[in-house]
Amino acid sequence: MESSSADLFHPRRSLGNRHRTQAIKFLELADADPERRDQNLRWAEQNARQAVLHDFTNELNWTVLADVKRKGGDAGGLRAVLEDLFCVLGRDPELLSQLDEIDMLDAACELLNGALDADPLDADAWWEGNGADDELDLFERRMFKL
């Protein structure tokens, strides 16, 4: 995906990028400093959440948030991230109830990546994969169900 100059100066995207970068830095600090691991994970989570809030269309923001939850051992938080992503993608979050027996700490990041591969948040990537008329009809029906 190419960034245009308009993307670089979009205030919400810039804030999302800044918070994501901070979250990644705190994740690295959590790995490097076991004594302050929990504190750094909390800061990483706070920044990762802010990144998603400022720009929920950036797949990296979702990936970093899921990684923070996984490293923190928060299976319930991972499920909540997936539910939120499913809502953003126009999917029924109740579909996750089929996965109640699955260990979210092991599978959530893979599920998140699979969901983003099936329904990219980038509009151009989505159009390339779903631009056919029958796909658009399915998408339209899915949106009306929400």
Describe these PLM feature segments.
Residues 16, 59-60:
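Helix-start (N-cap) detector for alpha-helical repeat units in TPR-like alpha-solenoids
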Residues 1-38, 80-146:
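Intrinsically disordered, low-complexity, charge-biased linker/tail regions
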Residues 26, 68-69:
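Residue at a conserved register position within TPR or TPR-like alpha-solenoid repeats
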